[in-house]
Amino acid sequence: MTFISQAPSVSISSAGPSDYFALLKPRVMSLVIFTALAGMLIAPDPVHPIVGFASLLAIAVGAGASGALNMWYDADIDAVMKRTAKRPIPLGRVMPNEALAFGLTLSFLSVFTLGIVANWLAAGFLAFTIFFYVVIYTMWLKRSTPQNIVIGGAAGAFPPMVGYAAATGHFSLSSFILFAIIFIWTPPHFWALALGRSEDYRQAGIPMMPNVKGAARTRLEILLYTLLLAPLGVAPWLLGFASFVYGMLSIALGAAMLFFAARVYIVQEGPSADRHAKALFGFSILYLFLLFAEIVVERLVPIVVAMGAWLTSGMFPGFFH
């Protein structure tokens, strides 16, 4: 007689590396790296390259962990929405329990690594950021209030403050200004997208602003937030931690952002209304990228030039003198 032991069945998928990489939300992770780098570079003293690289890696992993935990919890609504139906869990390529374990493991590793290579203030704030995104936004706000993206958007705005804290061991007004720019940018960015996908959100039961307050109210709030964003984007120059070039760029970009937002508010019906909302969504990405790219470039170029001069003079002292 053959005895077969009965054990609890555990769902295990045949997921590959690309599936787990998709759980990290790489597009969001790249934005986190970029904004955290900007926060790190505005620190008054330069951070050691190895410490800086390791800190950015830890912050990126923390952002990826948040994405994995978000997909684990939102698997039910991801399967309903067209935009998210092809994510690894709805497709059955990654089991929910695997995504949960993956996200929790990366969360611990990212926080612990940042604490070791930088400092525990930055690590603690990274842990808080993960908690805020997963628990406050994903588990609570997202399904309960049309202000979900307003309050929850703080999680996506924290990386510059984490980067600054990793470089200095404290926070500053300058890092908070970068946080505020992303925080105020988030509602018009996501509501412009939500205007064209309100039916998708309705089917998933997510109370986005267009579904709860209507398209007209959403368009008005997009304009109001953009009116706040335009002068706020100039603040780094006015406060002295960004250059004149940044100041002129931020003024031009702010004016363009206002133009796109005003069109969304004025044209509320017909094919042009949807087209203007999509245009605002696309430009908002360019707006944030160019603002932070200018900060990164103007801080990195002197560092790269100085390192190049040091390397060439050290390696070929006779040739360059």
From Swiss-Prot:
Recorded topology in the membrane: Multi-pass membrane protein
Database matches in InterPro entries: Protohaem_IX_farnesylTrfase (IPR006369), UbiA_prenyltransferase (IPR000537), UbiA_prenylTrfase_CS (IPR030470), UbiA_sf (IPR044878)
Compartments reported by the entry: Cell inner membrane
Keyword Mitochondrion: no
Biological processes per GO annotation: heme O biosynthetic process
Pathway: Porphyrin-containing compound metabolism; heme O biosynthesis; heme O from protoheme: step 1/1
Pfam families for the chain: UbiA (PF01040)
GO MF entries: protoheme IX farnesyltransferase activity
Main location: membrane
Keywords for the protein's UniProt record, in alphabetical order: Cell inner membrane, Cell membrane, Heme biosynthesis, Membrane, Transferase, Transmembrane, Transmembrane helix
Transmembrane segments: 28-48, 49-69, 94-114, 116-136, 149-169, 176-196, 222-242, 247-267, 277-297, 300-320
GO cellular component, one term: plasma membrane
Reactions it catalyzes: heme b + (2E,6E)-farnesyl diphosphate + H2O = Fe(II)-heme o + diphosphate
Family annotation (PROSITE patterns): UBIA
Database matches in HAMAP family: CyoE_CtaB
Protein name per the record: Protoheme IX farnesyltransferase
Gene source species: Beijerinckia indica subsp. indica (strain ATCC 9039 / DSM 1715 / NCIMB 8712)
